[in-house]
Amino acid sequence: MSISRRQFLASTAAAAMLPDAPCRGFTTMKQASEREKDASGRPDGRVVDIHVHFDEKNANYIEDFLKVSDRLNLTALMLTPFSSRKVVAEAAGKYPKQIIPFGFVDLDAPDVVKQVEELHGLGYRGLGELEFVKKPYNDPSYFPVYELANRYGWIVLFHTGIVLRQKFDEPEDVASGRMRPIHLEEIARRFPKITVLGAHCGNPEYEWAAEIARWNSNVFFDLSGSSLTKMHGRLADFKRIFWWSGQPQDSKTPDGDTSAFVKLVFGSDTDLQNIDGVMGQYHAMFEACDVPGRTRKMIMGGTLGKLLGLPD
């Protein structure tokens, strides 16, 4: 039996977002999300999603995405398998406000450098989601790819933390330890023109992820995946992990924001129909952690918009 990570996460997130009776003083995810919509029912301001996987099996995926994009005022950094690079590049050319092309490559492929060069030539703006590596992310054999990304000034999205097992009846050369958030620190320091983005905030190594982001201006994380589902009843714990709001810092932050939470960006990593549900989970975390309104806007799109030079 095989199940994709996104299928698993979509099902668990949906279960977590079933209507329930709110406790006294507790704001539900739906209530939190509704507060930040304008009169049209769309989110107040552009949402930029770092973590939307192009589905090669859905012939109507672009059309389906555009409907969701219009409803949610959403721009997607569309994570694209190399085999679909031209399809998504063409779509991004037609719909530049909705689709920003990002390319998935296998870091262990013998022609990976040529693949990255081709993606750049097609107008891709970054790489991701890099995952299932045969060596730790900071292995020198991967440096030629990072050198190119550094030259291009790209965002590179790495899977971090635990990863779903897809095959149970045959061997897999997969290990979460190769994808720990601690490996991103060296990449960020060696290649300062890369914006290093870790998916899933290192789940379950949130504190390592947060501290690496704290001291490196070019490191951010998303909270996609199972974290906001499993932490549903204790979202305020993130305030302990992202603890340094208002403290003096040597590293720069987007717009000089002093909230520790500005080191997060929005990522959904789910089926199209569930993206608004993940938005609700983020807003519930904002409420539980008293994240300032200005910082919320940076997380939900402001930071990525500035990094990519997207028009307001």
Model-identified regions with their sequence ranges:
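Mid-to-C-terminal alpha-helical segments outside catalytic/metal-binding sites
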Residues: 2-50, 59, 63-76, 251-265, ...
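Catalytic pocket-lining loop regions of alpha/beta-barrel enzymes
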Residues: 28-31, 37, 126, 139-265
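Active-site gating loops and adjacent loop-to-helix segments of metal-dependent hydrolytic enzymes
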Residues: 38-44, 71, 96-98, 163-170, ...
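Divalent metal-dependent hydrolysis catalytic cores, especially in the metallo-beta-lactamase
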Residues: 47-52, 64-86, 99-104, 125-129
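A cross-domain feature marking catalytic cores of carbohydrate-active enzymes
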Residues: 50-54, 80-82, 103-107, 128-132, ...
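Active-site environment of divalent metal-dependent phosphoester hydrolases
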Residues: 55-58, 83-87, 108-111, 136, ...
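Short, acidic/polar
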Residues: 58-66, 109-119
